[in-house]
């Protein structure tokens, strides 16, 4: 392939990736119309070529429109303490390397927000965890894939840190915290879970899998999921280590600054948004900030040095936690917590917690 043909192909790849960010990958015809690429070529690129490039598509939910409050939890727990299976509504969980420390991203229905934190206190009281910290997110953002720093043919990042430093602004979809519940039904939850499991799935296929009328499901998708903006965006992610079964080539990193005020958050954000490996960031009302990165092992030293050298103003409040990529999990919308009649529910251990709490009150009355 000549140099001109390579440039032409690369421009088409860039265009397709930018369009996927806007509309997802489930509608090949719409992708074809918006990009001018032949529909069959679009189908091939989405189903085959992205994987060959070491990339994948992640569907991110709009927690605000789902009536959910999101945040970060950092938990200290010994291996002998059984607790992780007791915590629901997580959409990411990971374990620190070389420490009995765990991190989780959660999105819990607004009406359960206080009880959710009470659960963590209950687990600590029962000595099922050693300690915990909750950082409630006022906002979450999913930074966009940065194709200008990616070598598609070599399937790896090619980062010029001088160009990184010149990055201006930020890109990506943001969801804000809202103090309200949302009207979501069982069909909506089924559609969202199916799309998270397989971003290319068609509504007809989802209907067949759950035994629903395709017309009914199309209505729910159009009127609730799409118009209700229940999906925030579809983001292209670097997935080569997972695709090739080489988790040792990936280091996941949590960067956390605590209590630095809004000025400190803004300064830290500017640094983290320049780094092309950042895939999620969030901030609280009280000046906490966190970011999650998927860093190639051959870029770990450079990335850590870049963060440290550009965050001197918040150095005393900065923590960098390295996560074991083999023990990380991305979780879909918790369908099992949704009752078709009652909506979102509390898991059974909360009832156990309430009984113990009632007993304590009776003993002290």
Where does each model-flagged region fall?
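A compositional/biophysical signature of low hydrophobicity enriched in polar/charged and small residues
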Residues: 1-365
């Amino acid at each position: 392939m000549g140099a001109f043909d390579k440039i032409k192909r690369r421009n088409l790849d860039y265009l397709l990736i930018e369009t996927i960010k806007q509309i997802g990958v489930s509608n090949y015809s719409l992708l074809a119309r918006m990009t001018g690429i032949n529909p069959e070529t679009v189908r091939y690129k989405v189903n085959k070529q992205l994987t060959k490039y070491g990339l994948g598509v992640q569907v991110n939910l709009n927690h605000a429109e789902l009536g959910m409050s999101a945040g970060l939890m950092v938990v200290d727990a010994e291996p002998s303490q059984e607790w992780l299976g007791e915590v629901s509504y997580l959409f990411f969980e990971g374990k620190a390397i070389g420490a009995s420390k765990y991190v989780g991203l959660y999105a819990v229905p607004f009406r359960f927000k206080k009880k959710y934190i009470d659960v963590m206190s209950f687990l600590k009281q029962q000595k099922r965890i050693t300690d915990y910290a909750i950082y409630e997110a006022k906002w979450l953002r999913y930074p966009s894939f940065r194709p200008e720093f990616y070598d598609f043919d070599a399937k790896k990042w090619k980062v010029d840190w001088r160009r990184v430093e010149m990055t201006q602004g930020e890109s990506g979809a943001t969801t804000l915290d809202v103090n309200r519940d949302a009207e979501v039904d069982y069909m909506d939850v089924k559609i969202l879970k199916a799309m998270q499991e397989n971003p290319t799935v068609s509504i007809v296929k989802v209907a067949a899998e759950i035994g629903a009328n395709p017309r009914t499901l199309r209505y729910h998708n159009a009127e609730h999921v799409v118009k209700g903006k229940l999906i925030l965006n579809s983001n292209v992610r670097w997935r080569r280590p997972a695709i090739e079964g080489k988790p040792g080539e990936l280091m996941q990193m949590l960067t956390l600054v605590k209590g630095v005020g809004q000025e400190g958050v803004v300064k830290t954000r500017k640094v983290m948004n320049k780094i092309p490996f950042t895939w999620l960031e969030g901030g609280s009302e009280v000046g906490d900030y966190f970011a999650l990165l998927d860093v190639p092992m051959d870029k770990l030293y450079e990335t850590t040095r870049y963060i440290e050298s550009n965050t001197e103003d918040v150095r005393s409040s900065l923590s960098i936690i390295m996560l074991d990529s083999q023990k990380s999990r991305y979780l879909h919308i918790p369908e099992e917590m949704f009752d078709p009649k009652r909506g979102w529910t509390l898991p059974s251990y909360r009832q156990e917690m309430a009984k113990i709490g009632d007993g304590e009150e009776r003993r002290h009355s």
